[in-house]
């Protein structure tokens, strides 16, 4: 109450921020008359003057903002016959300040972006504009290019349909580049697998505006971009695990100390499976093993866990569909099919076994990055969306982005009615159809939002029976989708769409539809996120148009059933609600919103938790990529680096074979054998007589230096440096891939440390640091071994770089390019663990000192 009083007197923080921006709008408006009186050439000359001041450092972007915004507004009027509204100027300033502009549907976000894009492109460092699909990227670039071209800027578009690096490089070399988040991210990963700077396509990460920022930075935050290659692991275990999973009985969860019945319990809130003691015994009998959680059977245990998830947490036509005997993921937020993406951790293989289709082989990560860490690389990050305030805390904590709600140009007239709640889904379905029939009878257009493809089909079949013409929108073709959505506001139109389909395309209505009350939005289920519901509502009431929105719910809906159904059911029982009747109450609507807040909080904590782990790997990634870029630089002294590595290698090897501190006792036989094997170099015991430990290390280093120089003496210096650089890069890349595999193993088993009263995150940081030190040493020493052992003829020398690139291309072509991450930090997966890796059992010891030496120990799958 006290806070509400303060807000009424002083306004909210958002109100105060907007008020500050309005003061600057007045200054921009005062310049409008000056620029509208100029000819085209004079206007261009004025802009060129400001651009020169930016490039020379005489002024910065903030100094010229008023004039540049006024010029862009005037350019929009002349080229597109579109004038930026005052509130759009505010949106532009918010984006330029590196914040998120929350602007309602129909407020012209595409036009708003031109203001900060032009202002920040003046430095010549490039501006990226990110959209959610190729159609929107192409459309926005084409629509706004008239403004950019008038002011002398080039515009490029990065599309998934473009197959060559040349096309991508041309797009990135433009002043302004439009594209999707996936393409920007994958190009970054591919660039860091190239063998020369000239082959890279991206420039520096200067300024980026992310359209539909909530979809990309929140909804997609747990989905890493992955470039991967095939492995040689057997897939038979998934078939066995699937057969066992089908024979296990589901039990009901109970509160401790009571023990659940059945073989396993489904934890729907956390989307996890808990196997009971009886279930473990049954699985061991069916598999024919004594201990399911021994080292030898741990992969089988993991495959069983994934099989149980596949059967109990993932529904066909909800979470995935079958197309041409392939399991294709359905994006939970858009309802679109996610071609090319696969669930990780063996879950996709489990789904393929469940559906009895060909099981695709597992893959090994070659390079990966999350959107969270990719977009945080930019010098300045900004975003636009119609719905961001509900996630303002996450934007602030994860991305350091403030959310500013921009006032609408014309007040919203849409009526948002309270939810109607029914006892069963069938009652709800019938009520929705009756409401559609009423609206359709008078010609009012209706947009029906569903939570899944399966639900879309239910309403489609019911409308067919009622002989009501309609469109079903859950296609994967964004362009076709956009055309259908554009017609959703026409008289008599009935459109069924998954909640987010067609996003980025406005639904326009005419005067006849306005007289009928505007577009009618019917939500058939509350999403776990209030933001998705608000996006559905926002399809109606654009630019001050009338409209109606209402959600129809049932106690059998997942959200109410899992997170809040008991309280609402008791209210309905007290009110004596009969079959077919509904309840409409602000109390119930608030209870539903509270359930959504619970889920949002769970998801936020999950994303935050994952980021804490990913930040560890991200720092290592940045270090390796930074060093890799140094190696690509022609001015980098690779020969000095090799000499340094030879010295470290020599010291390391000598220490392994010196048997006492004085250095008087050295195992020369084994030392000579090692140097001959690894460096193709003969050494004599006489060379080391009467030398101290340090002198022996230096002597070995000198011998190896001379041997290396002699070996490479027949090559031209330029050729030699190129060979050294490429071979060093190959060693680095191979070591990095192996390191990513080790990190995957570490992350998979780290949750078990909690059973030993240790913080898994702290343990993960310690172990990953040790792994990184091993990685650095492996790069140093393996490069030395390779350089000493490699033999070339002249043709191979000339084609070395081409061959390296061809091998990379093969890897990229075989890659599984998108990973849909399931959060399985608590599951130990004992694969073919390298001897020096941390043992997955969680002991903290190296594998060779634990299970690799002493044989299997009993473990628990968390």
Swiss-Prot record:
Residues that hold ATP according to the record: 88, 106-110, 506
Note accompanying the cofactor annotation: May bind 1 zinc ion per subunit.
UniProt-annotated location(s): Cell inner membrane; Cytoplasm
Membrane-protein topology: Peripheral membrane protein
SUPFAM superfamilies reported in the protein's UniProt record: Helical scaffold and wing domains of SecA, P-loop containing nucleoside triphosphate hydrolases, Pre-protein crosslinking domain of SecA
Domain of life: Bacteria
Disulfide bonds: none
Signal peptide: none
GO annotation, biological process: intracellular protein transmembrane transport; protein import; protein targeting; protein transport by the Sec complex
One cellular-component annotation, GO: plasma membrane
MF terms in GO: ATP binding; metal ion binding; protein-exporting ATPase activity
Swiss-Prot/TrEMBL cofactor(s): Zn(2+)
EC number assigned by the record: 7.4.2.8
UniProt catalytic activity: ATP + H2O + cellular proteinSide 1 = ADP + phosphate + cellular proteinSide 2
Family assignment from sequence similarity: Belongs to the SecA family.
Main function: Part of the Sec protein translocase complex. Interacts with the SecYEG preprotein conducting channel. Has a central role in coupling the hydrolysis of ATP to the transfer of proteins into and across the cell membrane, serving as an ATP-driven molecular motor driving the stepwise translocation of polypeptide chains across the membrane.
The protein's assembly and partners: Monomer and homodimer. Part of the essential Sec protein translocation apparatus which comprises SecA, SecYEG and auxiliary proteins SecDF-YajC and YidC.
Protein name as it appears in the record: Protein translocase subunit SecA
């Amino acid at each position: 109450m006290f806070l509400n009083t303060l807000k009424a007197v002083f306004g909210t923080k958002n109100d105060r921020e907007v008020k500050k921006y309005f003061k600057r709008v007045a200054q921009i408006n005062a310049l409008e008359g000056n620029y509208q009186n100029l000819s085209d050439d004079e206007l261009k000359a004025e802009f060129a003057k400001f651009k020169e001041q930016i490039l020379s450092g005489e002024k910065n972007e903030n100094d010229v903002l008023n004039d540049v915004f006024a010029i862009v507004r005037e350019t929009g009027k002349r080229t597109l016959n579109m004038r930026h509204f005052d509130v759009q100027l505010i949106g532009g300033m918010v984006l330029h300040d590196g914040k998120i502009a929350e602007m309602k549907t129909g407020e012209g976000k595409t036009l708003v972006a031109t203001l900060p894009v032009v202002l920040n492109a003046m430095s010549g460092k490039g501006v990226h504009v990110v959209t959610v699909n190729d159609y929107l990227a192409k459309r926005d670039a084409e629509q706004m290019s008239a403004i950019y071209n008038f002011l002398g800027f080039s515009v490029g578009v990065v599309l998934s349909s473009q197959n060559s690096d040349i096309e991508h490089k041309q797009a990135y070399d433009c002043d302004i580049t439009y594209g999707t988040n996936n393409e920007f991210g994958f190009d970054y990963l591919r660039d860091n697998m190239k063998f020369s700077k000239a082959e890279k396509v991206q420039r520096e990460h200067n300024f980026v505006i992310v359209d539909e920022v909530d979809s990309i930075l929140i909804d997609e935050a747990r989905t890493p971009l992955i470039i991967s290659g095939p492995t040689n692991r057997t897939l038979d275990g998934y078939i066995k695990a699937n057969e066992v999973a089908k024979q296990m009985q589901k039990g009901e969860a109970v509160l401790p100390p009571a023990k659940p019945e059945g073989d396993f319990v489904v934890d729907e809130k956390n989307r996890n499976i808990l196997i009971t003691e009886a279930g473990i015994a049954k699985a061991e009998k069916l598999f024919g093993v004594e201990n399911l959680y021994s080292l030898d059977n741990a992969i089988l245990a993991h495959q069983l866990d994934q099989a149980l998830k596949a059967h109990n947490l993932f529904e066909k036509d909800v979470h995935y569909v079958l197309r041409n005997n392939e399991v294709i993921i359905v994006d939970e937020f858009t309802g679109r099919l996610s071609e090319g993406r696969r669930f990780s951790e063996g879950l996709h293989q489990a789904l393929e076994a469940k559906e009895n289709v060909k099981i695709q082989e597992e893959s090994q990560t070659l390079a990966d990055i999350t959107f969270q860490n990719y977009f945080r690389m930019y010098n300045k990050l900004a975003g636009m969306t119609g719905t961001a305030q509900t996630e303002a805390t996450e934007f602030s904590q994860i991305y350091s982005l403030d959310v500013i709600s921009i006032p609408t140009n014309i007040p919203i007239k849409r009526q948002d009615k309270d939810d109607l709640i029914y006892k069963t889904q069938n009652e709800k379905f019938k009520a929705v159809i009756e409401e559609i029939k009423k609206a359709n009878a008078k010609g009012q257009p209706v947009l029906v939002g569903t939570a899944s493809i399966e639900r879309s089909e239910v309403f489609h079949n019911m409308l067919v029976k009622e002989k009501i013409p309609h469109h079903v929108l859950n296609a994967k073709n964004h362009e076709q989708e956009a055309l259908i959505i554009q017609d959703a506001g026409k008289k008599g139109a009935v459109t069924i769409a998954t909640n987010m389909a067609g996003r980025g395309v406005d639904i326009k209505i005419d005067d006849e539809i306005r007289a009928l009350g505007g577009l009618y939005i019917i939500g058939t289920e509350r999403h776990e996120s209030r933001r998705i519901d608000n996006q559905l509502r926002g399809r109606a009431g654009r630019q001050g148009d009338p409209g109606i929105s209402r959600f129809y719910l049932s106690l059998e809906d997942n959200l109410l059933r899992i997170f809040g159904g008991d309280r609402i059911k008791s209210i309905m029982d007290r009110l004596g609600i009969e079959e077919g009747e509904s309840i409409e109450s602000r109390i119930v609507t608030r209870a539903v919103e509270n359930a959504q807040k619970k889920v949002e909080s769970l998801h936020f904590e999950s994303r935050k938790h994952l980021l804490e782990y990913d930040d560890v790997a991200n720092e290592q990634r940045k270090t390796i990529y930074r060093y890799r870029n140094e190696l690509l630089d022609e001015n980098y002294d690779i020969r000095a680096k090799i000499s340094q590595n030879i010295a470290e290698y020599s010291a390391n090897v000598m220490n392994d074979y010196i048997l006492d501190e004085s250095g008087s006792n050295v195992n020369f036989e084994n030392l000579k054998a090692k140097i001959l094997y690894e460096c193709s170099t003969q050494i004599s015991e006489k060379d080391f007589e009467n030398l101290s430990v340090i002198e022996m290390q230096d002597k070995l280093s000198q011998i190896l230096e001379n041997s290396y120089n002699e070996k490479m003496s027949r090559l031209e210096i330029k050729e030699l440096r190129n060979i050294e650089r490429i071979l060093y890069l190959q060693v680095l890349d191979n070591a990095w891939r192996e390191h990513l595999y080790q990190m995957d193993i570490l992350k998979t088993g780290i949750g078990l440390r909690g059973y030993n009263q240790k913080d898994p995150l702290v343990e993960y940081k310690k172990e990953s640091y040790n792994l990184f030190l091993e990685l650095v040493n492996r790069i140093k020493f393996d490069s030395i071994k390779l350089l000493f052992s490699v033999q070339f003829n002249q043709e191979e020398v000339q084609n070395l770089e081409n061959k390296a690139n061809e091998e990379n291309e093969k890897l990229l072509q075989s890659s599984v390019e998108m990973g849909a991450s399931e959060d399985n930090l608590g599951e130990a997966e004992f694969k073919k663990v390298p001897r020096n890796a941390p043992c997955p059992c969680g002991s903290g010891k190296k594998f060779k000192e634990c299970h690799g030496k002493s044989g299997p120990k009993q473990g628990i799958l968390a």
